Swiss-Prot record:
Record-linked InterPro entries: KH_dom-like_a/b, KH_sf_prok-type, KhpA
Record PANTHER family: RNA-BINDING PROTEIN KHPA (PTHR34654:SF1), UPF0109 PROTEIN SCO5592 (PTHR34654)
HAMAP family hit by this protein: KhpA (MF_00088)
Localization terms from the record: Cytoplasm
UniProt keywords, alphabetically: Cytoplasm, RNA-binding
Any one GO MF annotation of this record: RNA binding
Taxonomic source organism: Chlamydia muridarum (strain MoPn / Nigg)
Protein name (Swiss-Prot/TrEMBL): RNA-binding protein KhpA
GO cellular component annotations of the record: cytoplasm
């Protein structure tokens, strides 16, 4: 699932080499922490959040077949 998410995100941004994805696992829960270049955050969020909602919907669909809850968080670069 991590590779699937990375593939989607890297094809949306201008700087795919700056895409970093961290997977934090809990009991039946996976949290993905996504970090992208500052200029690419808007592309990931999309107009009115539509792009990030679509990405999250895809993740939930893929995770549901494994009975796992999944969450995607966009982390701010420091």
């Amino acid at each position: 699932m991590k590779e699937f998410l990375a593939y989607i995100v890297k094809n949306l941004v201008d700087r795919p080499e700056e895409v970093h994805l961290k997977e934090v696992q809990g009991t039946n829960t996976i949290i993905y922490e996504l970090t992208v270049a500052k200029g690419d955050i808007g592309k990931i969020i999309g107009k009115e959040g539509r792009t990030i909602k679509a990405i999250r919907t895809l993740l939930v669909s893929v995770a549901s077949r494994d009975n796992v809850k999944v969450s995607l968080e966009i982390m701010e670069e420091r």
